[in-house]
Amino acid sequence: HYREVYDLLGADYIIDESNEQRLTSVKRVGDKVSYHNDGIVRWGGAFSQIEYSNGMLSAFFNLSASNSGYKRIDYFKKRDLVLSDTTYREALGTSVTTNLIFDDQGNLVGANKTQVLDTIVHNGVAYTMNSDEAKLAETNWKNIPGFTIKTGANYNLDDKNNVFLNLGYLSKAPRFNNVYDYSNRLYRDIKNESVSALELGYSFRSSVFSSNLNMYYTIWNNKPSNGGITVTIDDIPFRANINGMDALHKGIELDLSCKLLSNLSLEGLLSIGDWRWTSTETVRFYDDDNSIALDPNSGDTIEVSFDADGVRVGDAAQTQLGFSLRYEPTTVSYVKLRYTFFDDYFADFDPISLGGENGGRDSWQIPSYDLIDLHCGYNFKLNQKNKLSLRLSILNLFDKIYISDAQNNDPYNDVSYQDFDAKSASVFFGLGRRFTMSARLNF
C-alpha cells in the first residue's frame, strides 16, 4: 500500500516528509509518498463434510476450521535494531537538525535543515539504519482462529419440485484493518465476528421453465466498523474496535428461466432485502491491567455511545431487479441483452457516528439507477477437434451516468458537512460504456 507521485502539474518537485528513513524530502514522479506498507495474510483451514441421500431426501453436515495470520511491514517507519541481547523498536532512520540563522542585531533571518542518520551505540558499537542489524519495522504474526458449522437438507416433492433448508454458524476473523493500526500496534479488543444464518427455499424444474425462490434470515453479531476508532490509554494512542455492533439481514430472492422458443430464452431475477443495524450501545475500554481506561486530561471514563438501532445497512443495493433475453440466430451464435435495476442503496457510514441527535438516522440514499449490457458470441469449428469461440461485451451500453458508491458525511471532503445528504457525501461514479472481447481455443 502506497501513494505515488505521477503528475507534478507543472512543478519541479513536491516536499514530503512522511518517510522516516528519507535522505531527502524532495519527491519527483515515481517516488512514493504519504505511506508505504504491506499487509501480509497467511490463511490455513480444514474442511469436513458428511452427506446422506436416499433419492427423495438428501442432507449434509459440514464442519470447517481456519486460522488467519496477519503481519504488517512498514517501509516508511524507522528501522528496528535487532541485537542478540535486546531490540530497539523503530529507532534507526533519519532525523532533521535545524540551525537557526541570526543577523548582527540578533534577529532570526533563516534556518538550515540537515538530514542526519540516527545512531545508537550499544556495547561500544555504533549502529545506523544501514547496519545489517537494522531491520524493517514489522509486527509479529497475529493468529486468529475461526470455524464454521453448516447443515442442510433437500426434499424432492416429485420430479419437478423440491424444497430445501440450510442452517449455519460462522465465527469469522476480523479484517486486517481491524487487527493492526498504522503504527504497527495491535488493536484493542480484537474479537471474531459471528454470523448465524437460516435459508429456506423452493425450486421448480421443467423442460421449458425453471425457478428458485429462497428466503434468508441472517444475524451478524460483532461487526466492527472498518478501522475502528482512536483511544488514548496511559498516554499512548491506540486504535480500538467497537465490539457489539450487530446487524440483521433478511430478504427474499427469486430467479427464473423460461425457454420462449427453441432459440429464444428469458431469464429474470429479483432480490428484496431488509438489512438493518440492531445495536444501541455504550462501549468502555480497558487498559492492560483490565482496569477501566480514563481520559488522561479529564479523568473521565473513555467510552463511546451510539444508536444504530433500525438504521439501514449501507454500501450495497438492497433491492435488485433484472432480466435478460438471449437469442440464438444459429446454432453457433447468440446475442444477449441484460437489464439490471438497483434501488434502496444507502451510502456507507460509520455506525458509531450515530450519537446524540443523529441517533437512529439513516445515511444518504444513493439515487436508484439501471444498466443495460449487451453480449454476443460466435463459435468457429476449425476442424473435427478444434473450436474457436469469440465473445464481445458492451457494458453500460447507453453510457449511463450513475453513482456506484458513496461515503456518508465524509470528513475528507474539502468542505465537510454532517447533514446526511448529498452535499455531505463523497461519491464514486460508475464506469461508463466499455468494451471487452475474449477468444477461447478448444483443442
Label the model's feature ranges.
Residues 1, 61-67, 165-169, 213-217, ...:
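Transmembrane beta-barrel strands of outer-membrane/channel proteins
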Residues 314-384, 398, 406-407:
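C-terminal beta-barrel architecture of Gram-negative outer-membrane proteins
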Residues 221, 266, 341-353, 378-443:
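C-terminal beta-signal and adjacent terminal beta-strands/loops
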Residues 28-220, 271, 326:
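Structural signature of Gram-negative outer-membrane beta-barrels, strongest in the C-terminal barrel
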Residues 53-57, 67-68, 75, 217-219, ...:
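Gram-negative outer-membrane beta-barrel transporters
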Residues 2-32, 70-140, 177-186, 225-240, ...:
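Solvent-exposed loop segments that connect transmembrane elements
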Residues 46-52, 151-155, 200-204, 215, ...:
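Residues on the lipid-exposed face of transmembrane beta-strands in outer-membrane beta-barrel proteins
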Residues 56-59, 160-163, 208-211, 263-266, ...:
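Repeated loop/turn-to-beta-strand initiation elements of outer-membrane beta-barrel proteins
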